């Protein structure tokens, strides 16, 4: 984690010194489709769904830094045995900071790569029922996670760009449950 942050700071300092007049604050809205996956000793679960994201950041030229908020689809699991049922639900929200490098191809098309550090809020609810027993459990936890991203932007004007990208996020681990997200999104970035 410290190595990632040190690298991001070093990249941002060197990039700021080389930046051109294309600097400025921006906001970006993305509509995404995500696949949330969980792994634990009991097996694997996945859920696909809509994941909107809102970002605000600063464009230094070929380097951007952005803060974002992502809301993920609720992950549900149903298990039924001979004498019991277990219904689980995981809700997840994420706030993060991304460092993004844009490859300047001297054209409107700009591929990019980046890294992300996030704070993720998990809400986990279990409902266990058997013949003579009923138990519910609710857990709320906040975990840190890391991720990588890649995509391509297309400059419509000097201040407006279309964006299409992929993100992988390791969202954290709680009570033996690892949560990962694979996201594909499209959006619009407006620079001020």
Spans of model-derived segments:
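Short glycine/proline- and aromatic-enriched beta-strand/turn motifs that initiate or cap beta-hairpins
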Residues: 18-63, 189-191
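Outer-membrane beta-barrel "beta-signal"
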Residues: 26-28, 154, 180-192
């Amino acid at each position: 984690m410290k190595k990632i942050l040190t690298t991001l700071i070093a990249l941002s300092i060197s990039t700021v010194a080389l930046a051109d007049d294309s600097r400025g604050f921006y906001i970006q809205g993305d509509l995404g489709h995500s696949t949330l996956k969980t792994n634990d000793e009991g097996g694997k679960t996945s859920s696909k769904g809509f994941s909107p994201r809102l970002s605000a950041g600063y464009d230094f030229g070929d380097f951007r830094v952005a803060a974002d908020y992502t809301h993920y689809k609720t992950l549900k699991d149903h298990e039924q045995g001979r004498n019991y049922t277990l219904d689980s639900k995981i809700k997840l929200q994420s706030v993060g900071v991304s460092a993004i490098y844009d490859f300047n191809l001297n054209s409107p098309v700009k591929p990019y790569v980046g890294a992300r550090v996030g704070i993720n809020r998990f809400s986990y609810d279990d409902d266990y029922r058997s013949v003579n027993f009923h138990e519910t459990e609710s857990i709320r936890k906040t975990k840190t996670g890391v991720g990588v991203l890649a995509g391509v932007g297309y400059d419509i004007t000097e201040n407006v760009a279309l964006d299409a990208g992929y993100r992988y996020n390791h969202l954290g681990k709680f009570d033996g449950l690892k949560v990962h997200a694979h996201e594909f999104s499209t959006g619009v970035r407006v620079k001020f």
